Amino acid sequence: MKKTFYHYMMKHRAPLVKNEISDLAEAIYDDLSFPKQSEDYHEISSYLECSGLIESMSIFDKAWDLYLQER
């Protein structure tokens, strides 16, 4: 079974060293409306753009690339 993007990002929460991806993981965790079951790039990127959770979509793109490498 494939992990959802949400599930993948949860492993980046509360790291020893904070970075952009760990900050995104915390924001996603705190957002009750985040599409937790989605594996779709366009659905998640559209949600993040509209929600204001993220300063730059390049952070999401980095996280998405890491997610794809582990799938």
Swiss-Prot record:
Species of the source: Bacillus cytotoxicus (strain DSM 22905 / CIP 110041 / 391-98 / NVH 391-98)
One Pfam family matching this protein: YozE_SAM_like
Domain of life of the native organism: Bacteria
Similarity field: Belongs to the UPF0346 family.
Lineage: Bacteria, Bacillati, Bacillota, Bacilli, Bacillales
Name this protein carries in UniProt: UPF0346 protein Bcer98_1690
